[in-house]
Amino acid sequence: MTMRKRIAFLAGAISFDNQNRVLGGVLKRASELDMDVYVFTCFVNYDESEENKVGAFRIIDLPEFDLFDGVICMKNSIQYEPAVNSLIARIKKSKVPAVSVDEKVDGMYNVGISDYSSQKDIVEHLIETHDLKKINYVCGILQGKEGRERYNAYRDAMEEHGIPVCDNQIYHGNYNRESGRKAVEQFMKYNMPQAIVCANDAMAIGAMERLQQNGYRIPEDVIVTGFDNDELSEFFVPSLTTVDRRQELLGKNAVNLLFERSDDVNVQIDTKTIYRESCGCNMQPAMEIKDLRMEYQNKCLIYEEALIH
């Protein structure tokens, strides 16, 4: 009897929609190929204390990689440098084929997207289509590739259009909804911008929540955009302009790279910018649809808060 091939999948903050969707793609493709997937992850958030991160990320010390036929690692999601460094060293030492999702790692296959061009498309859309100039930005974690590239894209788009950016137009967040809420509180101390561009959907939704609580209309008073195309982005009121990273396809391609042994060690997946109501595009939903979306949105927010706490 032939033994089924085994894949180790490693990621942090699995409660985030991005990691879940990539894992979904991995599981679907592995099932099609009659392979087993062993998942090593935790529910740690990016803003956890050092002590909590040390404990939570011990989970990624468990797998003996020599026992697997391939490894898929979401390095960007493990926001604790000692754990990341130890993990990468152990994977390389094992000599087992490995794929890094999103961030390139020497000696591994890589599947990812262009965070830079995807984020730049949104900023340029606001400048060129909506004729905006005062555009603020809510960063992700700049130590990671995706946070750094998205921030650089915002700065470059503004500079190329001759639009200056002040320090008080930037808020340094950590990908959760609370970062979006706090960003709005900071921006309210100054003149409110025409638009707030966020490095992910969770922060964008947090920003929209706080704006609405303070009487701002979206997009009439302030435009908001996100990144990731999380499930809630489509159903929030107003629906969120965002970038579809096609995470499930990333996961499927990660499995393919492990076993097809392609000469191209770096595979880039095309993203899709989705223009919705939060930037003023594609308005006019029927009122009953809005009511249903609001009900769904509230249920999702309650569920996500329960996961966090």
For each predicted feature, which ranges?
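Flexible loop/turn connectors
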Residues: 33, 183-284
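Alpha-helical recognition/docking segments in bacterial nutrient-uptake
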Residues: 1-124, 187-188, 202, 309
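Short beta-strand/turn micro-motifs composed of small residues
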Residues: 11, 41, 73-75, 100-102, ...
